From Swiss-Prot:
The active site is at residues 65, 110, 204. Disulfide bonds join 31-163, 50-66, 98-256, 142-210, 174-189, 200-225. Monomer. Keywords: Disulfide bond, Glycoprotein, Hemostasis impairing toxin, Hydrolase, Protease, Secreted, Serine protease, Signal, Toxin, Zymogen. This is Snake venom serine protease KN13. Snake venom serine protease that may act in the hemostasis system of the prey. Residues 1-18 form the signal peptide. Coiled coil: none annotated. Residues 19-24 form a propeptide. It holds the Pfam family Trypsin. One of its GO terms (cellular component) is extracellular region.
Amino acid sequence: MVLIRVLANLLILQLSYAQRSSELVIGGDECNINEHRFLVALYKSGRFRCGGTLINQEWVLTAAHCDRRNMEIKLGMHSKNVPNEDEQRRVPKEKFFCDSNKNHTQWNKDIMLIRLNSPVNNSTHIAPLSLPSNPPIVGSVCRIMGWGTITSPNETYPDVPHCANINLFNYTVCHGAHAGLPATSRTLCAGVLEEGKDTCKGDSGGPLICNGQFQGIVSWGGDPCAQPREPGVYTKVFDHLDWIQNIIAGNTTATCPL
């Protein structure tokens, strides 16, 4: 009887592990409406383009490759088609880049800081996300979110943001997976090694939140998205803290790390 109970317990553990493993390769689900108060949507000519992160009442952090003329920024949005009662809209007052010529690559300087034309107030669906106080730790579980396509290579854009958990890897994993990446860069590598979870087109500029801290900005990844052993690449927020804080403090000539 003891042996039977032991074998039964082992079977339960194996089934439990298998279930968790299968869950890891399933794409994201609709975000809880209250978990993304800092997530903003960047629009151009009425069309959704990118995500971004509100870091205080007047500033948004996103990817440099999301830059467009005449952008509109929507805050407090969940459904694209059914507005929240506290949604707010802003336009950029100023935009700042690591390079005065707005140059960036897939592994360097894909970061943009936007000053809003007027501050926003905290509300039910709007609140900033603090900048990280500690560097990211390889092995962390990270949260991704956005209104990007939920299928690839055929594109299906959802009405509401989708969220998923992925893992933070050593940069060498992305260096080995993506041709052209240098041996080192100021980016993070995150995803799942099995097929099925990833950020994709439209998620650019949104946050990578690891252990509750804002550590990355969605930059780029494989095409199609969510392929086995092809994690995504994220601009490393922690490495750019001095530049971000200097710009916000009024030192508009501050430079990004090399």
